Amino acid sequence: MAQNKKERLLWGLGLLGTAVFSLLMVWLHYQQLISTGYYYSDIPAHMAGRAMGNTGFSLVTILLRFVFGIGGNLGTAVFLGAVNLLTLLIFAWAIRKAVPQVCPGAALLWSLAANLCQAVWMPNGGYWYFGAITGTIYHNTTYIMLQPLALIAFFLFLSLAEHHGQLQWRSWAALTVLLTVATAIKPSYLFVFAPALLVALVVDLIRTHGKAIPWEVWLGCTVLPGILLCIIQAKVLFTGGDDSGMALIFTTDFDPEKVLWGVFNYSARHGLMRSLVFVGAVVLLLFRQWRGAYAYKFSLLLFAISLTEGICLTETGSRMYDGNLWWGAFICYDILLLESLIQLLCSLHKKYARR
């Protein structure tokens, strides 16, 4: 009886927290849409066609204009708030699936904690966020819309990996479509997922001595449409006479204090260190537990590759100081944060069961 009361209380708190979170997201996006002064939000720019530079070449622009045409500012705010809510629910679903001892209400509360813990917005401060690496970002519509797609794609990949050697064609097709659509919205996730998948498949090839080559080849093909789309996007973005393109940051002349994200200016460097405290503690303290968890190890691989790309690569020309190569680190941190939380909950419930 006491257990049922506790679960009902957690359900109530979880639903209340989710409702408040959803309303706050709608309010925030609406305020950003109607702002007439200086604002940090990218919504107006993305709606005007500048989600891919100044080209108008963006699925986000098409979607935002369509939603705005139907519902105006309020409808657009509700749409973006619904996307934020979807991300929150995916977190809760993943926690419940991995740690079934966590009741649904508690899963919602843990999901809220994960989605808020790195997302302190500072519109009047010297730096936008507490934490240069954060999973939740409120001002960038392309990232907001990428977030649930990247999470679903991550779990679809895990479901395919669970059936090693036996390709699940529906999941394969769904993953291919999701990665392509996610790339059309923002290529940052595929820019990390593709090399991480290559590493995972090469390791699998060595481990199985080539006994699962057809499965590995087909799984590798999931990224091909997205890579083709990346090439098209690059041709659209990196044109003109300002030497636009991509390069190793150490080979370029740049002002460290102008770089929005990275390890070169004071705010970003200290924010980065703050961001790594929790996930770093899980890596060190729960090593014996997570070394057998494929989902966690793949999320760690994704983040390691994304962090390397963010530190070592930069766009050149007029986009050099925008920090766009760090978007991959943000979305992969989001996935690593979720998997780290799952590892923590698994550890806590194991200790509780032994009492």
List where the protein language model places each region.
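Hydrophobic/aromatic-rich transmembrane helices and adjacent perimembrane loops
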Residues: 191-192, 318-343
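Start-transfer (signal-anchor) and selected internal transmembrane alpha helices
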Residues: 1-27, 100-109
